[in-house]
A protein has these predicted regions:
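Short, Lys/Arg-enriched N-terminal segments with co-localized hydrophobic residues
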Residues: 1-12
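Non-transmembrane, aqueous-exposed alpha-helical and coiled segments at domain scale
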Residues: 12-217
Length: 217
C-alpha cells in the first residue's frame, strides 16, 4: 500500500489518504477525486510495486510512481523522500502521460533514495534461494531497497551531484554487496565503474525535477 497527502492552500487544509487493508482499497481513485481541488499532491512513500489506475478524458493511465493528480493543471505533484524511486520507471511513466497530452508539474525530493539495479538483482536472487518458501515478491527490488535505507547505505538523489561522496558510497556498497553475491548467491559481482555510469545516467534524467520539496511545501 502507498499513500498520498493533499494540500489546499486557501483553506490551509491537508487531507491524508492512507491504506489500512494491505492495498487495493482504492486510494488512487480517491486521491484523484480530491486532487481536482488541491494545490499539491504528495506521494510520500512506497515504490513501483504498488499501482493505481486513473481514467479520464486523456485516457487510461496505470501508474506506479507518479502521484494521483498528475492530470490536473492546478496541481503540483511531489514525490517525497519516502518513495523508492526507480528512475527508469519514473521516466517511462512520464513519457507515457506526455504522449497522451498531459504535462504534469512534478517535483522530486532531493532526499528521495534511488532504487538501484542491484536491488532488483538481490530481490530476484533471494526468491530463487528460498525456492518453495519464496515470499512471492514482485522482484521490483523493494525489500533490498528498504534494507539499505534503514542500514544508511542507500543513495539519495542529492548525492548524484557530489562526485566524491557518490564514489565513496558506491565503493562501500559494492564491497558489501559483492560479499553477499559471492558467498550467498554465487552470482556475478558488481562493478563500481558501471554503477557510477548508471548513476550519471540517472542524474541526467532526474535533474530537472530535483528540489528541496520540504522547503517547497
Amino acid at each position: 500500500a502507498f499513500g498520498h497527502v493533499i494540500f489546499k492552500e486557501e483553506t490551509l487544509m491537508v487531507k491524508a489518504i492512507v491504506g489500512a487493508n494491505w492495498g487495493d482499497e482504492g486510494k488512487g481513485k480517491i486521491t484523484d477525486m480530491f486532487a481536482s481541488e488541491a494545490d499539491i499532491v504528495v506521494r510520500f512513500q512506497g515504490g513501483a510495486n504498488a499501482g493505481h489506475t486513473i481514467i479520464n478524458e486523456h485516457g487510461r493511465f496505470a501508474l506506479h510512481l507518479m502521484p494521483s493528480g498528475i492530470c490536473y493543471d492546478n496541481v503540483t505533484c511531489v514525490i517525497g523522500n519516502g518513495v523508492a524511486l526507480d528512475i527508469n520507471k519514473f521516466c517511462s511513466e512520464l513519457e507515457d502521460v506526455k504522449k497522451a497530452g498531459v504535462n504534469p508539474k512534478l517535483l522530486v525530493s532531493d532526499r528521495a533514495q534511488i532504487l538501484m539495479p542491484y536491488h532488483i538483482l538481490l530481490d530476484t536472487y533471494e526468491e530463487e534461494r528460498l525456492g518453495k518458501n519464496a515470499f512471492g515478491s514482485t522482484k521490483s527490488g523493494i525489500a533490498p531497497f528498504f534494507s539499505d535505507k534503514y542500514a544508511k547505505i542507500g543513495i539519495q538523489c542529492n548525492e548524484l551531484f557530489d562526485d566524491e561522496m557518490l564514489k565513496a558510497k558506491l565503493h562501500n556498497i559494492v564491497t558489501l554487496k559483492n560479499l553477499i553475491l559471492e558467498h550467498v548467491y554465487h552470482k556475478p559481482l558488481l562493478d563500481e565503474d558501471e554503477l557510477y555510469n548508471t548513476c550519471m545516467e540517472y542524474k541526467k534524467k532526474i535533474a530537472p525535477y530535483i528540489c528541496d520539496t520540504h522547503a517547497f511545501i
